[in-house]
Amino acid sequence: MACTFEQILETIENLTVKELNELVKLFEEKFDVSAQPTVVAGAAGGAAGGAGEEKTEFDVILKDAGAKKINVIKVVRQITGAGLKEAKEIVDGAPSTIKEAVSKEEAEEIKKQLEEAGATVEVK
């Protein structure tokens, strides 16, 4: 029984955030690859030498949900588009990454929303 690419994509589309994370880890182990972007040697040297350069991509990390956990789950659902179960798993698994490689403005907006809901957030 052969699967078509469309069937594979449809299956992947229906995975939760947690399941997608596990799938990526399995790919990394099975094929001995990394999901991390490759850094060009010249670019790394330039970034280290130029302390004045501003970072353009940021990760938003939920450190703690705080006392208003339900409000934080609602905001996480809104931001990530995850279902209730997935959003709860993200919040319960803190510290966890909410969004990766977003602009500074988007990262600050997400941080503001989560902090207003009662969470402790870090932007890296």
From Swiss-Prot:
Q: Does the keyword Ribonucleoprotein apply?
A: yes
The record's section on InterPro entries has:
Ribosomal_bL12, Ribosomal_bL12_C, Ribosomal_bL12_C/ClpS-like, Ribosomal_bL12_oligo, Ribosomal_bL12_oligo_N_sf
For this protein, the record's SUPFAM superfamilies field holds:
ClpS-like (SSF54736), Ribosomal protein L7/12, oligomerisation (N-terminal) domain (SSF48300)
Quick check: keyword Oxidoreductase in the entry? no
User: Which domain of life does the UniProt lineage start with?
Assistant: Bacteria
Q: Which UniProt keywords apply?
A: Ribonucleoprotein, Ribosomal protein
Indicate the transmembrane segments per the record.
none
Biological processes per GO annotation = translation
GO annotation, cellular component aspect: cytosolic large ribosomal subunit
Single GO term (MF): structural constituent of ribosome
NCBIfam families linked to this entry = L12
> How the protein assembles, per its UniProt entry?
Homodimer. Part of the ribosomal stalk of the 50S ribosomal subunit. Forms a multimeric L10(L12)X complex, where L10 forms an elongated spine to which 2 to 4 L12 dimers bind in a sequential fashion. Binds GTP-bound translation factors.
Query: Family per UniProt?
Result: Belongs to the bacterial ribosomal protein bL12 family.
* Functional description taken from the UniProt entry: Forms part of the ribosomal stalk which helps the ribosome interact with GTP-bound translation factors. Is thus essential for accurate translation.
Listed name of the protein: Large ribosomal subunit protein bL12
**Its encoding gene is what?**
rplL
